[in-house]
């Protein structure tokens, strides 16, 4: 099975939609690998995997551990790793951490949240051979600072600012973009103006591809569902029903039956 490369993704822009999903371990990465073009080891793991209410709190070593696990399961998909909160606060710190992630995980790219102020950081990383996905629009790592998760591009000033971010960061060397929580018309304009692929989450259908957090898409997190999430499976219900059946069989001495026992 051919490994997806950055050149493959460039070729897909305006030709074929790019499919991306999150993964945090080898088991699910292996399941997803045949059906997606890209896998994101996102800091969303702090929420869906760690049970927190925000992405802040992860370390570079946390991301490395989970990326290694995903790498063990996914052999085809283009693998992107989030730079966690605080790991890219200066260009030199970002370079040091990105090199560490690159060397220890074998990932294909790192993702950095930020506006045009991150241009120097992205330029330095790309000059050192590191592929960068720039994350613009709604930036979860800024949720405390902004007082929550707020959709971007609703007014002319906001829309103009996001478009400027995209153009500046592409010029700095960003090879990919993640557009999150952006009004669809604005995301469409960004995708048309950029030469590199855009992956959307909550940013409409005009992006070059889409990404979802796997536990959202498959219904394993049933406490809250954002507007942009389509559930393709009611996973939590299936697991609960299966677990109830297992528990009932154990309580009533129906499992294990002789079929599942070793004999002389």
UniProtKB/Swiss-Prot annotation:
EC number(s) given by UniProt: 2.1.2.11
Catalytic activity: 3-methyl-2-oxobutanoate + (6R)-5,10-methylene-5,6,7,8-tetrahydrofolate + H2O = 2-dehydropantoate + (6S)-5,6,7,8-tetrahydrofolate
Cysteines paired by S-S bonds: none
GO MF entry, a single one: magnesium ion binding
Active-site residues per Swiss-Prot or TrEMBL entry: 180 (proton acceptor)
Keywords: Cytoplasm, Magnesium, Metal-binding, Pantothenate biosynthesis, Transferase
Top-level taxon: Bacteria
Main location: cytoplasm
A GO biological process held by the record: pantothenate biosynthetic process
Associated pathway: Cofactor biosynthesis; (R)-pantothenate biosynthesis; (R)-pantoate from 3-methyl-2-oxobutanoate: step 1/2
UniProt name for this protein: 3-methyl-2-oxobutanoate hydroxymethyltransferase
Taxonomic lineage of the native organism: Bacteria, Pseudomonadati, Campylobacterota, Epsilonproteobacteria, Campylobacterales
């Amino acid at each position: 099975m051919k490994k997806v490369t950055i050149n493959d993704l460039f070729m897909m822009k305006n030709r074929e939609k790019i499919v991306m999903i999150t993964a945090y371990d080898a088991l699910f990465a292996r399941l997803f690998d045949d059906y997606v073009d890209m896998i994101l080891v996102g800091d969303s793991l702090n929420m869906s995997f760690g049970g927190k209410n925000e992405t802040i709190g992860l370390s570079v070593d946390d991301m490395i551990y989970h990326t290694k696990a995903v790498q063990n399961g996914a052999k085809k998909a283009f693998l992107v790793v989030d730079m966690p909160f605080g790991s890219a606060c200066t260009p030199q710190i970002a370079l040091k951490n990105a090199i560490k992630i690159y060397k220890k995980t074998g990932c294909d790219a790192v993702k950095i949240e930020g506006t045009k102020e991150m241009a120097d950081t992205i330029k330095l990383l790309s000059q050192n051979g590191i592929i960068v996905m720039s994350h613009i629009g709604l930036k979860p790592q800024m949720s405390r600072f902004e007082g929550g998760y707020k959709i971007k591009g609703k007014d002319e000033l906001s829309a103009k600012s996001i478009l400027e971010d995209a153009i500046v960061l592409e010029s700095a060397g960003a090879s990919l973009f993640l557009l999150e929580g952006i009004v669809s018309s604005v995301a469409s304009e960004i995708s048309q103006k950029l030469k590199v692929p855009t992956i959307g989450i909550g940013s409409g259908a005009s992006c070059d591809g889409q990404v979802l957090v796997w536990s959202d898409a498959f219904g394993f997190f049933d406490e809250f569902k954002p507007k942009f999430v389509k559930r393709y499976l009611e996973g939590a219900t299936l697991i609960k029903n299966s677990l109830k059946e297992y528990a009932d069989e154990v309580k009533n001495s129906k499992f294990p039956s002789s079929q599942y026992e070793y004999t002389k």
